[in-house]
Amino acid sequence: MKKVIHIGLPELSEEELIRVGEIGQKIIINYIFDHLAKSEVRDLEVTARINRGETLDLELEVYVEVPIFVKVDVESLIEEALDKAYEAIEDYLRRISNERGEKAQRTSEEP
């Protein structure tokens, strides 16, 4: 399952772009393993793609394989993990935006 959001912040450094992907991957992996034991997961793949254009697009793709005897709605679990990841990324981007806004405001206030 994958989900794409249009972030709309084209002015991120390479380091910030990498951090966005890392945040998404970390949140998803932690969320999956908060709900499943490691022994219940046969395969887990999390892919983050960032495309720069007029806007910044982030695509997170998650694949989870569990044995048939594990009673879990994998699609719902993935959807919840993706939602948590996008919330965390949104918080990170807001912090960056606020920091830049404060920096710009301080610069414009200086004589």
From Swiss-Prot:
Organism, as annotated: Pyrococcus furiosus (strain ATCC 43587 / DSM 3638 / JCM 8422 / Vc1)
Family the UniProt entry places it in: Belongs to the UPF0440 family.
Name of the featured protein: Uncharacterized protein PF0383
InterPro entries: DUF3194, MTH677-like_sf
Pfam families, per database record: DUF3194 (PF11419)
Domain of life: Archaea
